[in-house]
Amino acid sequence: MSKYISEQFRKYVAERANFQCEYCHIYQEDAFFPFHIDHIISLKHGGLTILENLAYTCSFCNSFKGTDVGTILFPKQKFIRLFNPRKDSWSAHLEIDDFVFYALTDIGAATIKVLNLNEVDRIIERRTIARN
């Protein structure tokens, strides 16, 4: 299937997410850079350009995620998939306290790792947004 995402799909995905990144939960209006439509399972891995495989993402989450679908977690040395906004409950895998993300599951840990959710600059960004 084509990697082209129609304007109709883009609008639907953004509205479905309430204009909020489906990974880090930052709102589009608070972000400096434009948001993206992400293939949850990338085309490279056989994902399709269908609504069930599209997520609304901030530029940082989209960039860090790339075509990844998971990662190896140590010390278990086990492949763990990333959080899937269409199939998973965010609060079942992740929580945030004082602008820092905490994993509740291996899926949460994999997502924090790959998306660099606790990178210092990202924590500072969340704190700055909260003050405004």
Residue ranges and their predicted role:
Residues 31-35:
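A short coil-to-beta-strand element that immediately follows conserved catalytic motifs
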Residues 21, 45-65:
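Short beta-strand-alpha-helix junction that forms the catalytic/metal-binding core
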Residues 1-8, 12, 27-30, 63-132:
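Extended charged
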Residues 8-16, 47-52:
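Short, flexible, mixed-charge glycine/proline-rich loop motifs
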Residues 36-42, 58:
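Histidine-centered catalytic micro-motifs used for acid/base chemistry in nuclease
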Residues 18, 25-26:
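A positional/architectural concept
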Residues 40, 45, 74-76:
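Short edge-strand/loop segments of extracellular domains
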Residues 26-27, 40:
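Histidine- and/or cysteine-centered catalytic micro-motif in compact active-site loops
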